[in-house]
């Protein structure tokens, strides 16, 4: 059995090398996607990031592309801020549409980026829809399922459910429905993680409700869409990343499914990120594993978590240097309506890994 | 990638919060307003009083059903129980106390046994108004202010008066009977209704869409960790305040629209019902002023039927009993009980301290504003303003502290304790310090 697994793993690795992952290749749109006007169908073929199905989607929905380019940009910045305290160097995401092995293989890091990208693209489309930038969508109809008997529907807040998720799903899932994108197990993993990302997005956009009544009773309840940041979604997915489950493929009946590698008695949860390949420790530079190492990475001497110098530097120690910061201070608000600040200089000590 | 930019925030706020809030605010109350108006118009038709009472009972039942559906039976049961007690004790002179105890038992049983918290919580406002009406009627009968037990249809008309049955406020039985006389339709009546309605929607918007995002979007104050806790507490507090004003102005609207809520002096009719005074709460002189300005009819009720009757046991006891009664009317919520009891101590200590300072300094520094002809020597000196200003700031801090955790649906005790711990029990400590100071200057 162990030999079979080893063989299978080797086989998957070989296939991954032969067919580079294109599930999130569209993140490469940030490179030159913003310089294109997206008003002619031939623009869809100019860029590297799109697979054939996505090109078709692009041609039929040119107006979506601005949102998708924006989503690619947002995904990269959210990824950057989420992982600044981790050893894994997120800069490899900048090489999209061609990825180094840390993202090209079915690693935990790839699971995070894939799910985040799926969430952000749906979010961006939904917001464009809500703001009226997309002529092809309109205010959502009254949902058939009522949240509660006294729940009243309020406005266009729910464009996410019907248009953002649908179009976002069509776009981000498209590469994985193509057999040439990689082995089936890899595609199943990506599709699962895409779904997790969208679910996190859905959960974060719950309605906020408030009660009004005599002395705080609940005679009248008003509900509205809560304002959400991408950083909220990103933080949620990061915690799922930290508790992600390693899976192996298994034939169950006529279908191939992913099941947890360790405890083989339970199915994979719908809210769990999954990965196929274990990650290196990212301490030293190793091109084969896509590890850039932590040398010269900034760390926090006083912290105790993953950003601490002890963990970030993998025990190699760190160097200290000073930096002069120029920042705004003594800000005052002037009625109405602007803020004026003075400029101050502050010297801080920084630490980087050896 | 931080929070939304300011411009993006305001765009999001408009479509995501302002619009849905107004839409839902009107959607849920337009039928109530319509029924109030129909009731008012029908009373102008010259119907016999019997039919007038009956029409408002029908309107009241319908609005109760609109808001609470079948759960309205609990309100109906309470009113039937009240009438039964009044009828059975019609020859007694202690109807007030007896009815009060009966209602208390009913409310406690309801709270503890009869149904799930969410449903009971929804109706609590209406139950409270019914209880207050019945108790006031009983005491007024004892004192002869109302000369005989009203007929069933009169009683039910009073209890289910469509103008006050959902959002209050409490009005006396005599006020209701005055309303049944049905004053002429007039521009000032209509304008009062419209203006109160507009005010209520404005307060709803502030409660939902402005207060929760006050810092740093509306007012660019960022602050350090400690200050941010207080800023957030202030936001929660403000949101709760404006929710109360929304309900108060809505109550003004429905009451006026239904034909009550006026004062009459020598043929001069004024549609001047006032339930809450927002400016006196948001820019308070003292906590005493805050407490009375929060809900004027309720203040009047508590003063008339609880405080004055308890005064024979001493002013401190009377104050505590008043706040206890208020807490019980609000239901068995640890949070509300804790807030009201704390409020009771705060107001009492502030009151006696300022009274003492006023005597020692011979200055206008009482909890309530001095009339212009008071005999204090010092009225407009700078240090008088400073003392009053200090107490105002204290009141603002108390309000922020007490209102920092109003999520009425979860009555978990530990949450209140936790929130007050986060704010270092500041108001409690300050109140204690003021009490020590008061004892020192006795």
Swiss-Prot record, chain A:
GO terms for biological process: camera-type eye development; canonical Wnt signaling pathway; cell fate commitment; cell migration; cell migration involved in gastrulation; cell-cell adhesion; central nervous system development; convergent extension. It comes from Danio rerio. One of its GO terms (cellular component) is cytoplasm. A lipid is attached at residue 215 (O-palmitoleoyl serine). CDD domains: Wnt_Wnt11 (cd19343). Residues 1-23 form the signal peptide. Disulfide bonds join 129-137, 139-156, 209-223, 211-218, 283-314, 299-309, 329-344, 331-341, 336-337. Belongs to the Wnt family. The keyword Lipoprotein applies. The keyword Nucleotide-binding does not apply. This is Protein Wnt-11. InterPro entries: Wnt, Wnt_C, Wnt_CS. It is found in: Secreted, Extracellular space, Extracellular matrix. Palmitoleoylation is required for efficient binding to frizzled receptors. Depalmitoleoylation leads to Wnt signaling pathway inhibition. GO terms for molecular function: cytokine activity; frizzled binding; protein heterodimerization activity. Glycans are attached at residues 32, 39, 89, 300. Keywords: Developmental protein, Disulfide bond, Extracellular matrix, Glycoprotein, Lipoprotein, Secreted, Signal, Wnt signaling pathway. The gene is wnt11. Ligand for fzd5, a member of the G-protein coupled frizzled receptor family. Plays a role in early eye development, possibly through wnt non-canonical signaling. Promotes eye formation, at least partially, by antagonizing the Wnt/beta-catenin pathway. In addition, promotes coherence of eye field cells, potentially contributing to the coordinated morphogenetic behaviors of cells in the nascent eye field.
């Amino acid at each position: 059995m162990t030999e079979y697994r080893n063989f299978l793993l080797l086989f998957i690795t070989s296939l991954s090398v032969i067919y580079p992952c294109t599930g999130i290749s569209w993140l490469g749109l940030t490179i030159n996607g913003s310089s294109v006007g997206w008003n002619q169908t031939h623009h869809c073929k100019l860029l590297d990031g799109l697979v054939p199905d996505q090109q078709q989607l692009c041609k039929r929905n040119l107006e979506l592309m601005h949102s998708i380019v924006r989503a690619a940009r947002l995904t990269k910045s959210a990824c950057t801020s989420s992982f600044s305290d981790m050893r894994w160097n997120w800069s490899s995401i900048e090489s999209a549409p061609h990825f180094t092995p840390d993202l090209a293989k079915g690693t935990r890091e790839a699971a995070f980026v894939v799910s985040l990208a799926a969430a952000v693209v749906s979010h961006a489309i939904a917001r464009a829809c809500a703001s009226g930038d997309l002529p092809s969508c309109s205010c959502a109809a009254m949902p058939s399922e009522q949240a509660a008997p006294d729940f009243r529907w309020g406005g266009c807040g729910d464009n996410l459910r019907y248009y953002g998720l649908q179009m976002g799903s069509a776009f981000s899932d498209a590469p994985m429905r193509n057999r040439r994108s990689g082995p089936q197990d890899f595609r199943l993993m990506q599709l699962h993680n895409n779904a997790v990302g969208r679910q996190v997005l859905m959960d974060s956009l719950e309605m906020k409700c408030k009660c009004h009544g005599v002395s705080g009773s609940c005679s009248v309840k008003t509900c509205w869409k809560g304002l959400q940041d991408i950083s909220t979604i990103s933080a949620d997915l990061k915690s799922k990343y930290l508790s992600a489950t390693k899976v192996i493929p298994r034939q169950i009946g006529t279908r191939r499914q992913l099941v947890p590698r360790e405890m083989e008695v339970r199915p994979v949860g719908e809210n769990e990120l999954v990965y196929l390949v274990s990650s290196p420790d990212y301490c030293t530079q190793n091109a084969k594993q896509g590890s850039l190492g932590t040398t010269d990475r900034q760390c926090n001497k006083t912290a105790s978590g993953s950003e601490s110098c002890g963990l970030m530097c993998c025990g190699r120690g760190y160097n200290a240097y000073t930096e002069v910061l120029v920042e705004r201070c003594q800000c005052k608000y002037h009625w109405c309506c602007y803020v004026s600040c003075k400029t101050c200089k502050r010297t801080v000590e920084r630490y980087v890994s050896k | 990638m931080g929070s939304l930019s300011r411009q993006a925030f305001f765009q999001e706020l408009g479509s995501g919060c302002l619009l849905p809030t107004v839409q839902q605010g009107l959607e849920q109350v337009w039928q109530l307003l319509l029924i109030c108006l129909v009731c008012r118009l029908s009373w102008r038709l010259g119907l016999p009083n019997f039919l007038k009472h009956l029409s408002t009972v029908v309107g009241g039942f319908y609005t109760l059903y609109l808001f609470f559906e079948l759960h309205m039976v609990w309100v109906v049961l309470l009113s039937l129980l009240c009438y039964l007690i009044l009828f059975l004790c019609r020859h007694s002179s202690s109807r007030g106390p007896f009815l009060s105890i009966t209602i208390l038992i009913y409310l406690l049983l309801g709270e503890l046994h009869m149904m799930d918290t969410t449903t009971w919580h929804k109706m609590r406002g209406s139950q409270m108004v019914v209880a207050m009406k019945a108790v006031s009627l009983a005491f007024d009968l004892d004192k002869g202010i109302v000369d005989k037990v009203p007929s069933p249809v009169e009683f039910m008309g009073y209890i289910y008066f469509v103008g006050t049955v959902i959002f209050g406020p409490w009005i006396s039985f005599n006020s209701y009977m005055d309303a049944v006389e049905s004053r002429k339709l007039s521009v000032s009546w209509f304008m009062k209704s419209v203006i109160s309605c507009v005010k209520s929607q404005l307060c709803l918007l502030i409660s939902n869409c402005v207060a929760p995002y006050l810092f740093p979007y509306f007012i660019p104050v960022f602050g350090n960790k400690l200050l941010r806790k207080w800023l957030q507490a202030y936001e929660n507090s403000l949101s709760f305040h404006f929710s109360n004003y929304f309900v108060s102005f809505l109550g003004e609207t429905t009451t006026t629209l239904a034909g009550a809520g006026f004062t009459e002096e020598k043929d001069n009719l004024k549609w001047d019902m006032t339930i809450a005074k927002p400016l006196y709460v948001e820019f308070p002189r003292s906590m005493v002023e805050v407490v009375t300005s929060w809900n004027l009819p309720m203040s009047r009720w508590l003063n008339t039927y609880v405080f004055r009757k308890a005064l024979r046991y001493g002013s401190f006891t009377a104050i505590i009993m008043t706040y206890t009664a208020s807490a019980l009317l609000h239901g068995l919520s640890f949070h509300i009980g804790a807030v009201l009891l704390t409020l009771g101590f705060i107001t009492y200590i502030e009151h006696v301290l300022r009274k003492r300072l006023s005597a020692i300094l011979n200055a206008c520094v009482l909890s309530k504003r001095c009339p212009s002809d008071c005999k204090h020597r010092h009225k407009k000196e700078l240090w008088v303003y400073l003392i009053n200003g200090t107490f105002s700031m204290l009141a603002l801090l108390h309000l922020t502290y007490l209102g920092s955790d109003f999520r009425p649906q979860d009555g978990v005790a530990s949450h209140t304790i936790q929130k007050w711990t986060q704010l270092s029990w500041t108001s409690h400590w300050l109140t204690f310090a003021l009490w020590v100071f008061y004892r020192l200057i006795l």
